């Protein structure tokens, strides 16, 4: 009964647990618990190798403990049982059972099998977490873990494990992994330690990587599996499997043994289940296997499948996905509104609905369609009274069959019928709006109304729904309202319907336009829709277009009785006149090289200021012959009379002169870019009172009334009167009767234009003379001018006289905007748009279209002109509307415009020049285009004087008067001396005669400076050039060469680099210059290199003999009797192969034996056994690995044995107890010394005492006792072996007696060494125990082998480090070669003295080496001697001759008596003597000589060190001074750059503030805003901070020089600061809302602070004087140091300056950023100012409310607080105003600092440039042959 209750409780627990777990899955992802996948799957677990599976097998373990059993038996034929079969080691033993004695069972493989696999097969897909393997044996040397996801069809490797990954798994990375799925080899779990219970751990996911998506395909591939396989590939052994000298089999100790294998995981449910059940068909032993992990998920979240990998049926409204935090949108139920029970998922619908629904219902009922059966089928629609779930909710459609489509199809939702295209209505029973004619036969149902919607009234239906007739808008007509009335357009082209044409009244021919596009019909050359724009190349003429310049008018006779008739002046050079007809600009004249066809110039005398031009006496003569006189460029010119000029003169026309003195005078006015032009044409005509002008008008465009306008400029304040008379020349015009009466109007002094009140009628086609006489009105001022400046005459059409032109409204606008008054003014004022439009229309009307631009093809940039006015774009100095004339004082109209005359005022009579040639009018004796030079033969412009050249030259320099092109071989400023190569006296008339040195000067063979006459003989003699000699300088001096027979030959200095005697005439070839007698051991055609056998710098006379070691030098380069041939530059000797060093005196790495017959020999070190290829350079011994030896490491080393080609093993012999080489090279048996025994020769042999390693023999009797005891022991052992068995043995008295006797004998024997014998007994007992428990075939593993290997590795690393240390020790400080040249010369003589000693030492070394080799051979032979070979050794010793040995050692045979033996002997107490040549005396002499040499070299080294220290001290001092100078320069440059930027920014800020504050229109509110912006800048507030700032400034200024030039600038800046202070005071006076008392006080304090700054600056200037003196003292020292520095100093300095410039640019950029920050702060301050204003306004309102109302106490308190805040704010503003003054001070100081820094930088730049020039000059000199 109790058992039944327990079983029931267990069932309830099992049922309740899943329910609780499933509740956790609601709304969240859930996962089954992890477990051991091995549990319950013993049948699915297999191993490829198991020990004792078919028969019992023996195996052993490794152990070193005594009395420990080492070998056991494995019998796995039956399962494991604690009592009956504990030796079973099947694979199921590794499944964890948590039993107390779980270490008593394990799985074990067969012995010596390397490749073994363990495989776990799962029944479904599982999720894998990690694997843990716990080994009983060593862990495998290499293994790998694989997984399968397809039940074993394919496998993938999880991870590799190996002790040596590179050898076990080549090509596999050893990590670390770069990504979570990287395949790497892990070496952490494959070592020899621990020997048992070692673990191998594999995690499916590396925890070092972050996992963002656990359902990523890569992650899923790592954690899911159906099969797991562990492959062991190689056993871990201790190396004894390779040994062959033992008898036992080592394989029995090596196998795989596992205590347990844990595979942690869970059933894979994709996050949709927390419980799993057994898979169908699997064992149902859930209750018998607790902890088993099953493979089928109990799915939640509406999922299904073994792994919950899909949705349940009818749950497809949301897609399946792995479990997440919120799983409400996974596998949702489909919504088919009860019309279907089947659905499927469509991704397209899911995406289209934005992830809301993806389920599509299948097989909808009740006339339903749609993804959710939510729609009615065709010809049905949803009944609005029923729900969607109602099976009767879809009802049939009710549509008009004539107006609907598809037999009455309707909308399935609202029942709306589907109408034809032009039908509407719920039942499709009427036409749409805009359509008419409902018809069954019409496919569209109704016809479209064809009305133009722009021309139709948009009210309701645009046409009748039955007839289709349209209803038109205004100005539209037609059956479809698609046409505009005449005078309108735009229907269909604009959005406004029919709009007026609005054609231009002047530009269009009529008011009507095209009804399509509104284009008006234009007059010629007019374009645009309204015809109001001129075509390209045309323009609209303004009102004042018809202008007649006064300069082109003819003079009228003087009418005043007080003024005489003006003198008759003939026409000057023609000025272009306006043409008589359009086009108004004439074509450009072709340029001509001469301005006149024929002229004769008569040069007059210089004219006074107001000259009266008089004709010459020959006037009558020229006039009779057809010539006339004219003034051109200030000269009276006779020109050929032309017919037109004659006709004009007959007509009484004359021109106006340029010269003063006449009633009329032309005044040209030059135009400037910065001057407004208030005149037209070239200038004015200055008209005297009573004089007049005649204007010829011949280009009237149309018969109209015109206003006469006169433009002028008065010279006084008096008004003038103009009398106008118009004379018609031509036929009369009835429309314009000729009125020749005089008309008068006033020219007021205050104006610039005057208009005749009444217009005059002028007809086109006629020519008119408009005569105007100017009279000055009476004036009270007697000194007022009687002249007036007349500019031009203008004709302005009267708008009212233009027939049928414009309406009264246009005329009213014309008058309202004063269009005529504005058009009359000169200067190109911009007219109002209304005036410009009306005038343009009138111009097009009058001229029948637009007027052609006619821009001059040379003077204008193009053919286009301005649309209104027609002004062309002129080139420089070109004027006129058409750009056809040169401006005054210019000439030569050409492609680049006109050129300025630039007449020299001191050489010309006027500023005018010929407009064609540009020739100015020159004074006497002056010529040139600009009258700027003297005539040839004269100089000294403008006071030209005749050249003084002693009649030997015709011209001279026009400025200095130096004569040019002197004749007759004369020279000099005044041709006062002879040329070089000539002798004479040109001043006294003595001609220049040639000198022959040896030929004439200029012949190429003149080799003298000059020649002179002998004062006695008068014969000329030569003064030879350097290098020439002889009476005629026709040969070269000694040390010079040259072939003087060739043209251009010269004697040049022989370039032999100072290596010849310059006094030796044969030192170089006199013709070729080749050096023949080189000195100082040099050779070559220029003595430029050292002789063979010498090296050094031949240019510095420093060629030294080569000192090559002949042993290591190439024999072909070392001839007998002469030094070896080394490199002539470096002294490097030509070494034999394998030899190195400058003198070829040492072997190269990899070579040895310098004393060999052929130099150094290769080491030939064994590549496999040597540590490197380098050997000892004397002995040739290679550096071997620890286990190898021999000279080239081709033998096993000491204490090692074996085949060196395969492996050398450690003998482990005790070196103190062995003889060389410690053990047998083939068997490894230790070779013990006599008296030593043991397998390792580490103990004394029997019969010897125990004092190891001495092991002295015992007494002779000891051998007898030892033999007796040994025999007895053998008998006792024999007796024991004869016993049947130990159990049946019974002690007998006889045997017991014998045993006792044996013990007594042993005690007797041990009386001498009892302790030692006891140890031997213990050792014997241990040996017996080991013999009993150890297999006879076992190999004893010595653990010291591993320790020795580690020691060898440490030794190898130490040798490498030692080698690196030696190489670095060889590197010494590099000393400048030039610095030690002098010291090296001293070494040279010491070296010569030591060379002989060195050779003696080398000879002694050879003898020593031979002696050492002899000793080594003897030692080696002695070591090889064995006890059994002593007779051989004795024979060899007897064969030795003492006399011979004595002779080799001491120098003489030792057979003589000691008194007679001069060299002594072995028995004489001495060896060697003065003349003895034995090895010992030679060695002693060599040692003494070596000691002396070492002392001398040590002394020399000391001297070298002292010299090197002095050089270093000098270099350090130089570097220190240089660094100090550079630091000062850097500091100056940085400071200058910083303040230069601050100065620029500060100046810009001050200018902006000054400009703003000086504006009188600035309001006080704006000033306050500006003050707030400035006050927002945080500056030092307290006087102490300001003082600290000034002290910092003084410290900076103390390191800067040259203040004097800046003090004046500082005073100016102080004045500016004072002005700024006054301006600030004005600002404060204007700021009424701010209390200014504190600000005024702050300003006064600022003034005092200014004075203090001045005092501080004076003190700084005094300090500067002291610094300047120190700098002056330092400059010579710096200069000397710079001279001794390398030539790269200049380049370094320039690079540093360039770096400073770059830093300056960086500081400038930072300054700009600071300025931007300041601007941002300023804007912020402005915003703050606005907030302050708003606060003040609110405050005023609050005050007003408080006075008008009775408020509560709380409101009053609030008002009080606000008042206090406002007062505090006002005080804050006052404080900020004080900070403004501080800012001004800082700005001034910054400006001063910037200027000072700039000057310092300029001085440093100049110093650098000078230094660079100096260095370049030095380099150029050094590059020459001689300095």
Swiss-Prot record:
GO terms for biological process: animal organ morphogenesis; axon guidance; basement membrane assembly; cell migration; retina layer formation; substrate adhesion-dependent cell spreading; tissue development. Residues 1294-1335, 1385-1449, 1485-1554, 1584-1820 form a coiled coil. Residues 1450-1476 are annotated as: Domain alpha. Keywords: Basement membrane, Cell adhesion, Coiled coil, Disulfide bond, Extracellular matrix, Glycoprotein, Laminin EGF-like domain, Repeat, Secreted, Signal. Disruption phenotype: Significant defects in apical-basal distribution of Muller glia cell bodies in the retina. Pfam families: EGF_laminin, EGF_LMN_ATRN, LAMB1, LAMB4, LAMININ_IV_B, Laminin_N. The keyword Kinase does not apply. It comes from the Eukaryota. Residues 1477-1827 are annotated as: Domain I. GO terms for cellular component: extracellular region; laminin complex. Disulfide bonds join 267-276, 269-297, 299-308, 311-331, 334-343, 336-361, 364-373, 376-394, 397-410, 399-417, 419-428, 431-446, 449-463, 451-470, 472-481, 484-498, 501-513, 503-520, 522-531, 853-865, 855-872, 874-883, 886-898, 901-913, 903-920, 922-931, 934-944, 947-956, 949-963, 966-975, 978-992, 995-1011, 997-1022, 1024-1033, 1036-1051, 1054-1068, 1056-1075, 1078-1087, 1090-1103, 1106-1126, 1108-1133, 1135-1144, 1147-1160, 1163-1175, 1165-1182, 1184-1193, 1196-1208, 1211-1223, 1213-1230, 1232-1241, 1244-1255. Laminin is a complex glycoprotein, consisting of three different polypeptide chains (alpha, beta, gamma), which are bound to each other by disulfide bonds into a cross-shaped molecule comprising one long and three short arms with globules at each end. Binding to cells via a high affinity receptor, laminin is thought to mediate the attachment, migration and organization of cells into tissues during embryonic development by interacting with other extracellular matrix components. Positively regulates apical-basal distribution of Muller glia cells in the retina. The alpha-helical domains I and II are thought to interact with other laminin chains to form a coiled coil structure. This is Laminin subunit beta-4. The gene is lamb4.
């Amino acid at each position: 009964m109790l058992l039944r209750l327990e079983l029931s409780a267990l069932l309830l627990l099992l049922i309740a647990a899943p329910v609780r777990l499933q509740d956790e899955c609601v709304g969240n992802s859930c996962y089954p618990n992890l477990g051991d996948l091995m549990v319950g799957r013993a049948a699915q677990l297999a191993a490829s190798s198991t020990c004792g599976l078919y028969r019992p097998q023996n195996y052993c373990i490794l152990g070193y403990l005594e009395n420990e059993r080492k070998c056991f038996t494995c019998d796995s034929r039956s399962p494991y049982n604690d009592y009956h079969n504990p030796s079973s080691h099947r694979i199921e033993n590794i499944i964890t059972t948590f039993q107390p004695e779980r270490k008593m069972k394990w799985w074990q493989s067969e012995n010596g099998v390397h490749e073994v696999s363990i495989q776990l097969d799962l029944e479904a897909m599982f999720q894998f977490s990690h694997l843990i393997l716990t080994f009983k044996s060593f862990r495998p040397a290499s293994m790998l873990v694989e997984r399968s996801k397809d039940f074993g069809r394919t496998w993938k490797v999880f991870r590799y494990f190996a002790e040596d990954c590179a050898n076990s798994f080549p090509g596999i990375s050893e990590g670390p992994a770069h990504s979570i799925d990287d395949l790497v080899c892990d070496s952490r779990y494959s070592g020899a330690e621990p020997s048992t219970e070692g673990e191998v751990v594999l995690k499916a996911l590396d925890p070092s990587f972050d996992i963002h998506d656990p359902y990523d395909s890569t992650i899923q591939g790592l954690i899911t599996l159906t099969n797991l396989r562990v492959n062991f590939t190689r056993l871990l052994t201790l190396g004894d499997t390779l040994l062959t000298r033992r008898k036992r089999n080592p394989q029995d100790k090596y196998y795989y043994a596992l205590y347990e294998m844990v595979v942690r995981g869970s059933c894979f449910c994709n996050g949709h289940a927390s419980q799993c059940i057994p898979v169908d068909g699997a064992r149902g032993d859930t209750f018998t296997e607790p902890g088993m992990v099953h493979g089928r998920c109990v799915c939640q979240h509406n999922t299904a499948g073994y792994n919950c990998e899909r949705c349940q049926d009818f749950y497809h409204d949301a897609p399946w996905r792995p479990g997440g935090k919120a799983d409400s949108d996974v596998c949702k139920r489909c919504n088919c509104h009860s019309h279907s029970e089947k659905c499927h998922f469509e991704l397209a619908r899911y995406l289209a609905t934005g992830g809301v629904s993806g389920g599509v219902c299948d097989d909808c009922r009740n006339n339903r369609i749609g993804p959710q059966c939510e729609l009615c089928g065709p010809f049905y629609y949803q009944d609005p009274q029923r729900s969607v779930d109602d099976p009767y909710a879809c009802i049939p459609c009710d549509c008009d069959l004539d107006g609907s489509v598809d037999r009455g199809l309707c909308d399935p939702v609202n029942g709306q019928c589907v109408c034809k295209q032009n039908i509407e209505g719920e039942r499709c029973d009427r036409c749409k709006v805009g359509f008419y004619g409902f018809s069954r036969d019409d496919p569209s149902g109704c016809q479209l109304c064809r009305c133009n919607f722009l021309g139709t009234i948009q009210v309701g239906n645009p046409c009748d729904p039955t007839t289709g007739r349209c209803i038109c808008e205004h100005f539209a007509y037609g059956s479809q309202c698609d046409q505009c009335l005449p005078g309108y357009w735009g229907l269909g082209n604009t959005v406004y319907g029919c709009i007026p044409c609005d054609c231009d009244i002047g530009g269009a021919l009529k008011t009507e336009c095209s009804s399509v596009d509104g284009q008006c019909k234009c007059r010629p050359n007019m374009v645009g829709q309204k015809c109001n724009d001129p075509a390209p190349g045309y323009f609209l003429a303004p009102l004042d277009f018809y202008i007649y310049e006064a300069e082109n008018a003819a003079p009228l006779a003087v009418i005043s009785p007080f003024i005489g008739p003006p003198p008759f002046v003939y026409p000057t050079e023609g000025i272009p006149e306006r043409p008589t007809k359009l086009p108004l600009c004439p074509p450009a004249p072709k340029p001509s090289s001469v301005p006149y066809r024929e002229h004769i110039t008569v040069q007059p005398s210089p004219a006074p200021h107001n000259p009266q031009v008089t004709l010459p006496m020959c006037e009558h003569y020229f006039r009779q012959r057809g010539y006339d006189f004219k003034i051109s460029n200030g000269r009276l010119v006779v020109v050929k009379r032309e017919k037109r000029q004659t006709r004009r003169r007959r007509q009484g026309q004359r021109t106006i002169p340029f010269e003063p003195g006449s009633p009329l005078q032309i005044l040209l006015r030059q135009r400037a870019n910065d001057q407004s032009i208030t005149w037209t044409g070239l200038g004015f005509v200055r008209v005297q009172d009573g004089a007049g002008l005649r204007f010829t008008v011949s280009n009237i465009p149309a018969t109209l009334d015109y206003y006469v306008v006169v433009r002028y400029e008065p010279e006084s304040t008096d008004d003038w009167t103009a009398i106008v008379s118009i004379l018609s020349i031509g036929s009369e015009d009835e429309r314009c009767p000729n009125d020749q009466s005089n008309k008068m109007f006033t020219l007021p002094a205050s104006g610039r234009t005057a208009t005749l009140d009444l217009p005059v009628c002028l007809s086109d086609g006629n020519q008119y003379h408009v005569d105007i006489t100017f009279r000055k009105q009476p004036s009270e001022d007697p000194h007022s001018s009687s002249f007036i400046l007349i500019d031009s005459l203008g004709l302005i059409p009267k708008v009212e006289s233009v027939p049928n032109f414009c309406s009264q409204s246009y005329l009213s606008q014309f008058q309202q905007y004063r269009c005529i008054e504005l058009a009359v003014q000169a200067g190109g004022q911009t007219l109002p748009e209304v005036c410009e439009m009306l005038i343009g229309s009138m111009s097009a009307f009058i001229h029948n279209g637009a007027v052609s631009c006619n821009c001059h093809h040379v003077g204008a940039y193009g053919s286009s002109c301005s649309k209104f006015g027609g002004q062309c774009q002129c080139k420089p100095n070109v004027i006129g509307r058409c750009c056809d004339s040169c401006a005054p004082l210019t000439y030569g109209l050409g492609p680049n415009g006109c050129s300025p005359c630039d007449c020299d005022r001191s050489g010309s009579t006027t500023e005018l020049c010929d407009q064609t040639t540009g020739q100015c009018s020159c004074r006497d004796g002056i010529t040139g285009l600009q009258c700027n030079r003297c005539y040839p033969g004269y100089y000294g412009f403008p006071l030209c004087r005749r050249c003084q050249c002693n009649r030997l030259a015709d011209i001279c320099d026009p400025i200095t008067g130096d004569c040019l092109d002197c004749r007759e071989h004369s020279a000099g400023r005044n041709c006062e001396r002879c040329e070089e190569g000539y002798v004479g006296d040109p001043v006294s008339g003595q001609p220049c005669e040639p000198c022959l040195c040896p030929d004439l000067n200029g012949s190429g063979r003149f080799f003298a400076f000059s020649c002179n006459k002998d004062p006695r003989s008068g014969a000329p003699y030569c003064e030879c050039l350097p290098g020439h000699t002889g009476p005629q300088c026709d040969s070269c001096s000694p040390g010079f060469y040259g072939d003087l027979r060739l043209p251009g030959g010269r004697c040049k200095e022989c370039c032999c680099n100072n290596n010849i005697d310059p006094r030796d005439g044969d030192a170089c070839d006199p013709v070729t210059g080749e050096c023949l007698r080189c000195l100082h051991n040099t050779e070559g055609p220029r003595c430029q290199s050292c002789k063979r056998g010498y090296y050094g710098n031949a240019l510095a006379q420093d060629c030294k003999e080569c000192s090559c070691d002949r042993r290591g030098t190439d024999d072909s380069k070392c001839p007998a009797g002469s030094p070896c041939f080394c490199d002539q530059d470096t002294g490097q000797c030509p070494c034999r192969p394998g030899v190195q060093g400058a003198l070829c005196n040492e072997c190269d790495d990899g070579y040895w034996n310098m004393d060999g017959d052929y130099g150094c020999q290769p080491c030939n070190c064994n590549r496999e056994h040597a540590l490197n290829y380098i050997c000892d350079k004397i002995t040739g011994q290679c550096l071997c690995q620890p286990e190898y030896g021999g000279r080239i490491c081709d033998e096993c080393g000491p204490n090692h044995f074996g085949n060196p080609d395969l492996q050398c093993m450690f003998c482990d012999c005790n070196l103190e107890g062995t003889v060389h080489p410690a053990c047998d090279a083939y068997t490894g048996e230790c070779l013990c010394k006599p008296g030593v025994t043991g397998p390792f020769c580490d103990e004394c042999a029997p019969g010897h005492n125990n004092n190891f390693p001495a092991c002295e023999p015992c007494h002779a009797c000891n051998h007898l006792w030892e033999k007796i005891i040994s025999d007895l022991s053998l008998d006792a052992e024999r007796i024991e072996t004869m016993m049947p068995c130990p159990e049946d043995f019974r002690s007998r008295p006889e045997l017991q007696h014998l045993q006792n006797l044996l013990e007594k004998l042993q005690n007797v024997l041990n009386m001498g060494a009892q302790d030692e014998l006891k140890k031997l007994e213990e050792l014997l007992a241990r040996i017996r125990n080991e013999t009993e428990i150890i297999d006879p075939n076992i190999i004893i593993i010595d653990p010291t082998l591993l320790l020795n290997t580690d020691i060898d590795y440490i030794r190898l690393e130490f040798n490498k480090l030692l080698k690196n240390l030696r190489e670095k020790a060889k590197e010494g400080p590099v000393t400048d070669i030039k610095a030690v040249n002098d010291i090296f010369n001293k070494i040279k003589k010491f070296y010569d003295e030591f060379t002989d000693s060195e050779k003696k030492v080398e000879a002694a070394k050879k003898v020593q080496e031979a002696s050492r080799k002899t000793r080594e051979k003897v030692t080696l032979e002695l070591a090889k001697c064995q006890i059994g070979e002593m007779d051989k050794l004795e024979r060899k010793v007897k064969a030795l001759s003492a006399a011979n040995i004595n002779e080799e050692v001491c120098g003489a045979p030792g057979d003589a008596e000691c008194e007679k033996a001069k060299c002594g002997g072995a028995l004489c107490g001495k060896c060697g003597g003065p003349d003895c040549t034995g090895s010992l005396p030679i060695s002693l002499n060599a040692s003494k000589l070596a000691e002396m040499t070492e002392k001398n070299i040590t002394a020399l080294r000391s001297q070298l060190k002292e010299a090197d220290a002095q050089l270093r001290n000098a270099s350090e001092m130089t570097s220190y001074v240089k660094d100090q100078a550079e630091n000062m320069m850097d500091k100056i440059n940085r400071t200058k750059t910083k303040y230069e930027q601050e100065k620029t920014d500060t100046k810009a800020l001050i200018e902006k503030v000054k400009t703003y504050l000086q504006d009188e229109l600035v309001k006080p509110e704006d000033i306050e805003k500006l003050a707030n912006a400035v006050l927002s800048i945080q500056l030092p507030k307290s006087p102490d901070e300001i003082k600290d700032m000034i002290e910092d400034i003084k410290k900076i200024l103390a390191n800067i020089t040259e203040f004097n030039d800046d003090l004046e600038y500082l005073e100016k800046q102080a004045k500016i600061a004072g002005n700024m202070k006054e301006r600030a005071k004005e600002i404060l006076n204007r700021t009424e809302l701010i209390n200014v008392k504190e600000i005024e006080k702050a300003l006064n304090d600022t003034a005092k602070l200014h004075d203090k700054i001045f005092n501080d600056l004076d003190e700084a200037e005094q300090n500067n004087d002291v610094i300047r003196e120190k700098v002056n003292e330092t400059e010579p020292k710096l200069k000397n140091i710079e001279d001794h520095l390398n030539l790269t100093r200049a380049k370094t300095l320039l690079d540093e300056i360039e770096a400073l410039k770059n830093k300056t640019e960086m500081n400038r950029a930072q300054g700009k950023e600071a300025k931007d920050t300041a601007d941002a702060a300023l804007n912020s301050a402005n915003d703050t100012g606005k907030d302050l204003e708003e606060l003040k306004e609110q405050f005023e309102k609050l005050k007003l409310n408080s006075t008008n109302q009775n408020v509560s106490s709380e409101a009053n308190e609030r008002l009080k607080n606000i008042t206090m805040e406002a007062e505090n704010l006002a005080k804050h503003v006052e404080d900020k105003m004080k900070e403004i003054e501080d800012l001004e001070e800082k700005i001034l100081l910054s400006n001063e600092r910037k200027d000072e820094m700039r000057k310092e930088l300029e001085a440093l730049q100049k110093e650098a440039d000078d230094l660079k020039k100096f260095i370049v000059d030095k380099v150029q000199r050094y590059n020459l042959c001689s300095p």
